Amino acid sequence: MDDKQYKGTTTVGIICNNGLVLATERRATMGNLIASRDAQKIYQLTDNIAMTIAGSVGDGQRLARMLQAESKLFELRRHGPMSINALSMLLSNLLWEYRIFYIQVLVGGVDKSGPKLFSLDPAGGRITEVKFSSTGSGSPLAYGVLEDRYKQDMSVEQGVELAAKALESAMKRDSASGNGMQFCVITPGKVEIFEREVGKQVCNS
């Protein structure tokens, strides 16, 4: 991968009993340089679906625009929204067909059957996650926290706190991760994206 590209790093996705939590840190690197301290790595795709990127920020931005456009066209043609499963399959096909996107993606949302989360590799490999997932250079550190502290039937409030702890663990040891956090909480009928400083608690869980 070209070191002159801006790269995003640690992302986390957690399935909760009443929704889905996606979280990322904000640093983007270009080789050994911290190129950005407020990189956008969460993108809302539809009224109930969002995705995170780890890897080339430019590739992630282009892919998000493609998915937003395709989901809008689908809705106009079919008179209804694209399902989470269908959008993740479209994403898988795009990644495989082009094979130029240097990114890992988490995509998920909430529909009639509940929260769903998928992880995809740069070649389009697609895995259905049943609890949580993490991508990027800090993911091994994030996974340690997720494996230890995840509980079945967590609320989204508890999911936000767990995601924050996982990101904080990655940011302490991974030089490509840092500079604050961004969260996306998806519940039935609502997508909320917000930021948070390291060390601050969003809610009491």
From Swiss-Prot:
Top-level taxon of the source organism: Archaea
UniProt catalytic activity: Cleavage of peptide bonds with very broad specificity
Location of the protein in the cell: Cytoplasm
Short name of one Pfam family: Proteasome
Notes on activation and inhibition: The formation of the proteasomal ATPase PAN-20S proteasome complex, via the docking of the C-termini of PAN into the intersubunit pockets in the alpha-rings, triggers opening of the gate for substrate entry. Interconversion between the open-gate and close-gate conformations leads to a dynamic regulation of the 20S proteasome proteolysis activity.
Quaternary context: The 20S proteasome core is composed of 14 alpha and 14 beta subunits that assemble into four stacked heptameric rings, resulting in a barrel-shaped structure. The two inner rings, each composed of seven catalytic beta subunits, are sandwiched by two outer rings, each composed of seven alpha subunits. The catalytic chamber with the active sites is on the inside of the barrel. Has a gated structure, the ends of the cylinder being occluded by the N-termini of the alpha-subunits. Is capped at one or both ends by the proteasome regulatory ATPase, PAN.
Protein name as catalogued: Proteasome subunit beta
Source species of the chain: Methanocella paludicola (strain DSM 17711 / JCM 13418 / NBRC 101707 / SANAE)
